[in-house]
From Swiss-Prot:
Coarse class of the protein's main subcellular location: cytoplasm
Protein name from the UniProt record: Eukaryotic translation initiation factor 3 subunit E
A single cellular component GO annotation: proteasome regulatory particle, lid subcomplex
Classification lineage: Eukaryota, Fungi, Dikarya, Ascomycota, Saccharomycotina
SUPFAM superfamilies: Winged helix' DNA-binding domain (SSF46785)
Length: 421
């Protein structure tokens, strides 16, 4: 499919996060199903998910003799790690120990070593155990183990890695509130750690791609969080500089975000979105970004209508956006209606209905609801099925303010790209 972003997003996802995307693509005609099955096998063959690998091997008509030996080794290693970490869990499950632990990890580690005989190496075994469980597809167990490890460890690199691991575990077990908490920790880690600019750019790209999971599985709350993150100075700069295809998801988050179109938060996000889409049109385009450009930059209703028809196909073939397709299309039609009414003083309901791919009766209900919801100064003339609109004039002073806002935003983006990236 022309606008499929799978090959753009895969390099920025962990193999376990890629698995649900491959499952989604099966049977959709975008890729050959046998090739997808082989890709799934190749993707997971280095993990500890041996039972599932045996099933995939059979489906592919292969007989991987090494899998049985690998399975036995996984079971053996799991038992060894359980035994090796038992003393750590026994200490952590002691209420007396919990009451003695403080916020200072260095002090805690000294206490655990001197009073309870736990070494740094034993604590680090929790990380290894959590990682092993994760690679076996036991995400809830891995999440719990990594939580305990992170609470005790003073190793910044391992703590950062454990945070990424917990983030993935919570995504894969659909613990969306916890996912957003982990995302906050990751942002703090990426923004505060002493990384060189190139490393920081790459880390932010991973945060952006991983965050698509909770943002589009968490209804309005998720889309709000996406807008807050992606429109922040450092992240919008990253998107524009390194992964402009993410604009597709920003378009959906803004337009299908659930806010009334008259709300100030929606209007601000929409203005910022239009500005960024216009800036990046030579770097990235798809039907969703072109819909925004057609409607708000070119004011071409015919082109916007054509792009909206293509948007539906793109949305329903995108793992992250399929569930938001109906909400996006509904909201996009409302936006088309509002802009159409804004540039006309008299609107023919039949013509507007045709533009929106609605019947005459649907169009009449649509425009009546639009006038009510958007508080337009308008009235319907039933004698000739038209809508008469009264547009208040915008002062030159207000127009200058709006232009200045746009220049200020762009200047800040240019400065941020120069400093941050």
């Amino acid at each position: 499919m022309e606008y499929d972003l799978t090959q753009k997003t895969l390099p920025f996802l962990d193999r376990h996060l890629i698995y649900p995307l491959l499952q989604f693509l099966k049977g959709r005609g975008v890729y050959n199903d046998t090739e997808l099955l082989q890709l799934e096998y190749d993707l997971l063959k280095d993990t500890n998910m041996t039972d599932y690998l045996v099933e995939l091997s059979k489906e592919l008509g292969q007989n991987d003799a090494d899998l049985q030996a690998k399975k036995e080794n996984v079971v053996k290693t799991l038992a060894e790690l359980e035994e090796a970490t038992k003393p750590v869990f026994e200490v952590l499950e002691n209420p007396e120990v919990v009451s003695e632990l403080k916020e200072n990890k260095t002090q805690n580690q000294a206490l655990l070593t001197s009073k309870y005989g736990l070494s740094v190496e034993q604590i680090n075994l929790l990380y290894k155990f959590g990682q092993f469980q994760y690679n076996a597809g036991r995400y809830q167990a891995a999440s719990d183990i990594l939580y305990h490890f992170r609470a005790l460890s003073t190793d910044p690199e391992l703590v950062a890695s454990a945070t990424w691991g917990r983030f993935a575990c919570e995504i894969l077990t659909s613990q969306w509130d916890s996912v957003l908490e982990e995302l906050g920790k990751l942002r703090d880690s990426v923004d505060s750690r002493s990384l060189d600019p190139q490393q920081q750019l790459h880390q932010r790209m991973w945060v952006i791609h991983w965050s698509l999971f909770p943002f589009f599985q968490n209804d309005t709350k998720g889309k709000d969080a996406l807008c807050d993150l992606f429109f922040s100075s450092s992240y919008i700069s990253t998107i524009q500089a390194a992964c402009p295809w993410i604009l597709r998801y920003l378009v959906v988050a803004v337009i299908a975000g659930g806010h009334p179109h008259t709300a100030s938060v929606f209007q601000k996000r929409l203005k910022d979105l239009v500005r960024v889409v216009g800036q990046e049109e030579y770097e990235y385009q798809d039907p969703l970004t072109r819909f925004v450009k057609s409607l708000y930059i070119d004011y071409s209703f015919e082109d916007a209508q054509n792009q909206l028809a293509d948007c539906e196909k793109v949305l329903k073939q995108d793992f992250f956006l399929a569930d938001s397709a109906d909400a996006f299309l509904e909201s996009a039609r409302k936006l088309m209606s509002q802009v159409y009414c804004r540039v006309h003083q008299r609107v023919d309901i039949a013509q507007l209905s045709q533009t929106l791919n609605l019947s005459q009766e649907q169009g009449e209900k649509w425009i009546a609801n639009l006038i009510k919801d958007s508080r337009m100064d308008a009235k319907i003339d039933e004698s000739d099925s038209t809508v008469i609109l009264n547009h208040p004039s915008v002062s030159v002073y207000q127009q200058v303010i709006e232009k200045t806002k746009g220049l200020t935003f762009r200047s800040s983006q240019v400065l941020n790209q120069g400093v941050t990236i």
